[in-house]
Amino acid sequence: MIFPSVKEQLDIIVNNTVEVISTDELERKLTKSLKNGTPLKIKLGADPSRPDLHLGHSVVLRKLREFQDLGHEAILIIGDFTAMIGDPSGKSKTRPQLTAEEARENGKSYFEQASKILDPEKTTICYNADWLSQMHFADVIRLSSHYTVARMLERDDFEKRYRSQTPISIHEFLYPLAQGMDSVHLKNDVELGGTDQKFNLLVGRDLQREYGIEPQVCITMPLLVGTDGSEKMSKSLGNAICFNDTPEDMYGRTLSIPDSLIETYWNLLVPHHSGNDKPIAERIAADPRETKRELARELVAQYYSAEEAAKAQEHFDRVIVNKQAPTDLPTVEFEEATMPVVELLMALAAFPSKNEARRMIQQGAVQAGNEKISDINAVIELTENPVIIRAGKRKFFKVARAKKSF
């Protein structure tokens, strides 16, 4: 295996990281790897607490891809066992525990989604239940003896909960130990994670040392702020842009980020800036709107294609900017001649509930043809001539009465 020089590798690896523990150790590992012609083992774990990956996950996945491109071995761990514990990192209360079935089901699509960034041919995928579920209670007791309660309470989230008398369950103390055992089992050289994973990564480093294994280098990456501009990107907070979003949704949600996040998103999410040598900060200062549109096109092109990115932009301009219906709407036909507006919206799955539908009607967010509907008891007349129903900013439906057959 031919690797780039140690300096070249370090420059790429350290770029955009928050912390490397430690750079000297990483340099020694890279030097040994180069001398022996053997790749380093790079570990990244992901608990399948939800079935969708979002752009926040892509930050560490891109760093793992950089290691792949440098010739090293990428190991992606699907934490189907640790997901049953629930990672307490950054949480102010105990997380719900998943069943084994839920964890496995959520994990099924993780590798497929991660392969939009990683090279699947050069990625080793593991499920940590394969080794953690084999441990006996005596093994857990021996493992627990390597760490103290005082050491656990050093982590910020546990310390805050302890001082505020918010309950901390014993199984939460076991989470970093279980994640650390992944590193003991794999004997990996490097582990990647977000800044909220620092404590867990360091536990893995300590446990490797305790078990006579050369300690891993820990590399932390920034946590991506979500579209709301304030909280860490999270599906549960509604501020996420997901890998599996439609091209139109991905484009629109990217344009919804505050201008203050454009540079961060560019640096963390776009590996190669597209044919423009001007520094991104200068481009944002000159024309933030166009730079954000370019960012949105870049992201859609990464996860779909340049053609889909162009279509997504055209859709956004037509529907959001010019407030016109999409040109490719299928017609949804109903047998009824009239329908109460709330029932019609529910039949179209325009909103998740009747209460939400009523609220949106009262806010003036529902339109039939050119007429804004403000009465929640309004009745929509359906004829064989289709009418466009607009629900919210981005949802359009073409509805008509089914033609009678004789």
Swiss-Prot record:
Return the PROSITE patterns for the record.
S4 (PS50889)
The record's CDD domains line, in alphabetical order, gives:
S4, TyrRS_core
GO CC terms, sorted: cytosol
Q: In its UniProt record, which GO terms are filed under biological process?
A: tyrosyl-tRNA aminoacylation
Q: Which SUPFAM superfamilies match?
A: Alpha-L RNA-binding motif, Nucleotidylyl transferase
Reaction equation(s) it catalyzes: tRNA(Tyr) + L-tyrosine + ATP = L-tyrosyl-tRNA(Tyr) + AMP + diphosphate + H(+)
| 'HIGH' region (motif): residue ranges | 48-57
Binding positions for ATP? 235
Q: Where in the cell is it found?
A: Cytoplasm
Q: Principal localization? A: cytoplasm
Keywords carried by this UniProt record: Aminoacyl-tRNA synthetase, ATP-binding, Cytoplasm, Ligase, Nucleotide-binding, Protein biosynthesis, RNA-binding
Per the UniProt record, which EC number(s) apply here? 6.1.1.1
Q: Which residues form the S4 RNA-binding domain?
A: 339-401
Sequence motif 'KMSKS' region, residues: 232-236
Q: Which InterPro entries match?
A: aa-tRNA-synth_Ic, Rossmann-like_a/b/a_fold, S4_RNA-bd_sf, SYY-like_C, Tyr-tRNA-ligase, Tyr-tRNA-ligase_bac-type, Tyr-tRNA-ligase_bac_2
Molecular-function annotations in GO: ATP binding; RNA binding; tyrosine-tRNA ligase activity
Q: What class of enzyme is it?
A: ligase
What is the superkingdom listed in this entry's lineage? Bacteria
* Subunit: Homodimer.
**Function, in words:** Catalyzes the attachment of tyrosine to tRNA(Tyr) in a two-step reaction: tyrosine is first activated by ATP to form Tyr-AMP and then transferred to the acceptor end of tRNA(Tyr).
What is this protein's name?
A: Tyrosine--tRNA ligase
Q: Which organism is it from?
A: Chlorobaculum tepidum (strain ATCC 49652 / DSM 12025 / NBRC 103806 / TLS)
